A protein has these predicted regions:
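N-terminal leader/capping segments at the start of a protein or of a new domain
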Residues: 1-50
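Glycine- and acidic-residue-biased ligand/ion/polar-headgroup-sensing regions
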Residues: 101-120
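A short hydrophobic beta-strand segment most commonly corresponding to one strand
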Residues: 104-106, 164-179
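Short acidic-glycine-tyrosine-enriched beta hairpin
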Residues: 118-156, 195-199
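Ligand-binding loop in jelly-roll beta-barrel domains
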Residues: 151-170
Length: 211
């Protein structure tokens, strides 16, 4: 198994990450990887025993705004795999944003409304650009439900917590999601760059590490 840094020490997380690395080593194809990870990921989502209280809190200083927290739970030594908990306060909506990585996203606590967008010029985003955006669908997610990300085809969305408690979604993504420079979009399709950051780990400051 490849090395990495764990920010939670609970056994279910260690077991899950071991399974993830085993799948990645056996399957170079992303579709096969996702298919093989569905069952262990579902089990992690359904186990309510392992996420410590400190990783269920909001973050007033979030890079996404609105008190949204991004708690890093595990990161590979090469920073090409991250498991994190996104905590969105009640009534708060994330910016429309992308992820720039394949992976799995599922709801662990609360309820979310997810709105996915199709972006026409998905290969060449620059700050200040205006891109054509069409809403693909709007759906409600409940605990245990999850979906796959496969950029660029379904990589742009926003979520809103519609439960009385904060929503917590678990993300398993193939990049250093909190520290890479990503894109967000306003309601008109105007593009801006942002870095969401991690609530429990600083990002490198050098420009070479930002992309």
């Amino acid at each position: 198994m490849s090395g990495g840094e764990f920010f939670v020490q609970e056994r279910p997380v260690h077991d899950f990450i071991a399974q993830v690395h085993s799948v990645l080593e056996r399957n170079p194809d992303i579709n096969q990887r996702l298919a093989s990870l569905r069952l262990p990921y579902r089990r992690l989502l359904e186990d309510q025993s392992w996420l410590p209280e400190e990783f269920r809190q909001i973050n007033p200083n979030s890079g996404m705004g609105g008190g949204i927290a991004s708690w890093l739970l595990y990161q590979s030594s090469t920073k090409d795999l991250s498991l994190f908990a996104l905590v969105v306060p009640p009534g708060v909506t994330t910016p429309i944003h992308n992820h720039l990585a394949w992976g799995l996203v599922g709801l662990y606590q609360g309820e979310q409304e997810e709105e996915e967008f199709e972006v026409a010029e998905h290969d060449h985003f620059h700050p200040g650009d205006n891109v054509r955006m069409n809403r693909r669908f709007l759906r409600v997610l409940k605990p245990g439900e999850f979906y796959e990300l496969m950029p660029p085809y379904n990589d742009v969305h926003r979520v809103k917590t519609i439960s009385a408690e904060p929503s917590i979604s678990l993300h398993l993504l193939a990049n250093d999601t909190g520290c890479v420079i990503r894109q967000r979009f306003d309601g008109t399709g105007r593009v801006d760059e942002f870095r969401s950051g991690w609530s429990n780990k600083p990002c490198p400051e050098s420009l070479a590490d930002r992309h």
